[in-house]
Each structure stands twice: as C-alpha cells, then as structure tokens.
C-alpha cells in the first residue's frame, strides 16, 4: 500500500 491505514 501507499497509505498508512492500508
């Protein structure tokens, strides 16, 4: 993922 919440 490219997001911290993935």
Swiss-Prot record:
The GO molecular function terms of this record are: ion channel regulator activity; toxin activity
Cellular location(s): Secreted
Keyword Signal among UniProt keywords: no
Q: In which tissues is it expressed?
A: Expressed by the venom duct.
Question: Which cysteine pairs are covalently linked by disulfides here?
Answer: 1-6
Q: What is its main location?
A: secreted
Q: Which residues are reported to carry the modification 4-hydroxyproline?
A: 4
Q: Which GO terms describe its cellular component?
A: extracellular region
Q: Where on the chain is Cysteine amide found, per UniProt?
A: 6
Keywords, sorted A to Z: Amidation, Disulfide bond, Hydroxylation, Ion channel impairing toxin, Secreted, Toxin
Keyword Membrane part of the UniProt annotation:
no
Task performed by this protein: Its target is unknown, but this toxin may modulate voltage-activated calcium channels (Cav) or calcium-dependent potassium channels (KCa).
Q: Tell me the domain comment.
A: The cysteine framework is C-C.
Q: Which family does it belong to?
A: Belongs to the O2 superfamily. Contryphan family.
Q: Protein name, please?
A: Contryphan Co838/Co854
Q: Which organism is it from?
A: Conus coronatus
């Amino acid at each position: 993922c490219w997001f911290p919440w993935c």
